[in-house]
Amino acid sequence: MATLTTARRLVVKIGSALLVDRNTGDLRADWLHSLAADVAWLKGLGLDVILVSSGSIALGRGVLGLPRTALPLEQSQAAAAVGQIRLARAYEEALAPHRITTAQVLVTLEDSEDRRRYLNSRATLETLLGLGAVPIVNENDTVATDEIRYGDNDRLAAQIAVTVGADQLILLSDVDGFYTGNPSDDPGATRFDVIDRITPEIVAMAGDAGSGLSKGGMKTKLMAAQMATAGGCAMAITEGSPLNPLKTLENGANCTWFTATLDPQAARKRWIAAMKPRGDITVDAGAARALEGGKSLLPAGVASVTGDFGRGDPVAILGPDGRRLGQGLCRYTGDEARAIRGRQSSDIEATLGYPGRAALIHRDDMAL
C-alpha cells in the first residue's frame, strides 16, 4: 500500500464539507491550520504539493445571506465570486506561518481540452512548484457553468494530477473510502482497502455519497480514479475531517487506494505517442543526437517544418534522413515554427516580435 512520504509530487483535493461548517457556514479555521501543518511537513520531506480546493460557493453563500439549499446558477456564480477571495486569503494565512508562499490558480476542465491552454497551465504550475510555492487550485466557478451544475472538483483534481505528473492524488472527503454499496443505506457495505483495476462491477457499486455542502459523489470520485490511474497517478479516498488529515492517513487511517500500473512520465509519453500528428518537424543530425540524449528540441536544430498546426498540437519529429524519431507537443504554431527554424532561442523575440519559450518542443512533451 502506498505511503505519502514515498511520493515525489502530491495533489490533495479538499471538499467544501471539510472547509466549511455545515451549520454556521463559517470556515473551519482549526482544521485548515492543521492541514497547513501537514503540508509544511510534506514539503520539509522534499515533496511538491498542490491543493485543489472546493469551498468558494459554500463560503460565499453565507456572506451573501443565501440559503444552504440548492441555488440557481446565477446565485452560485455570485457566491463563488465572493467566496473565492475569502478562500484564497484563508489558505494564505494558514500557510504563511510555515513560510510557505501560496498561489491562486483558477481553471476549468475545458482548460485541458485546449492544448495551448493545457501547456500554459502546466508551465505555470511547474514554475510555481519549482519556486517552492503551493498552488491552490479551484475551478473558476464564476464562469464554469457545467462544473457548477455537476460538481467536478474530483475530476479537476485528477486532471491537475495528470497535468503535472503527480504520482499520488489524495481526495479528502466525508467518506473513508470506496464501499461495495452506500454505507448510509446498506449496513452490510464493506470498504475496499486497495483497488487494482476498475472493473464494470466496481463502476456499478458507485453510489451518490455526497453531502449537503459538497456537490461531488462517489461516481465523480470513481471517474477521478479512472483518469488519475490511467495517467500513472495512484489515488486515495479517505475521510478528511480529523485534524492533520494527511498525517492521519500516513499513520494508517481508513482509506481506499486505487493503484496505477504506469509511472506518470511513461503514461504521459504513451498519451502523446497515441495522438494524430498535425504536422512534421525535420531536425538536423546534431538535434537528433541531442533528442536521443534526452534534450529538448530547440529552434536552432530544426531543418524544416510542414503542416498547419496550432500551439500545443502534436507533431511528428523526423531525422535528417526522414526517419521518424517520435512526436511531441509543439509550443509554437506552424507559421511561428517556420519563422524561427534554424535560429538561436535568443533570437526568438526579435524574429516574432514577442517573447517565446526557448524550446520548440520540451523534452517532457515528447515521446521518442
UniProtKB/Swiss-Prot annotation:
Catalytic activity annotation: L-glutamate + ATP = L-glutamyl 5-phosphate + ADP
Pfam families, per database record: AA_kinase, PUA
Record GO cellular component, one term: cytosol
EC number(s) per entry: 2.7.2.11
Disulfide bonds: none
PUA domain location: 278-355
Enzyme kind, highest EC tier: transferase
Positions bound to substrate: S54, D141, N153
Domain of life of the source: Bacteria
Pathway involvement of the protein, from the record: Amino-acid biosynthesis; L-proline biosynthesis; L-glutamate 5-semialdehyde from L-glutamate: step 1/2
Keywords: Amino-acid biosynthesis, ATP-binding, Cytoplasm, Kinase, Nucleotide-binding, Proline biosynthesis, Transferase
One of the record's GO molecular function terms: glutamate 5-kinase activity
Keyword Kinase set for record: yes
Subcellular location: Cytoplasm
GO BP: L-proline biosynthetic process
Residues the record lists as binding ATP: K13, S173, D174
Entry's family note: Belongs to the glutamate 5-kinase family.
Function: Catalyzes the transfer of a phosphate group to glutamate to form L-glutamate 5-phosphate.
Protein name per its UniProtKB record: Glutamate 5-kinase
Organism encoding this protein: Ruegeria pomeroyi (strain ATCC 700808 / DSM 15171 / DSS-3) (Silicibacter pomeroyi)
Record lineage: Bacteria, Pseudomonadati, Pseudomonadota, Alphaproteobacteria, Rhodobacterales
Encoding gene per record: proB
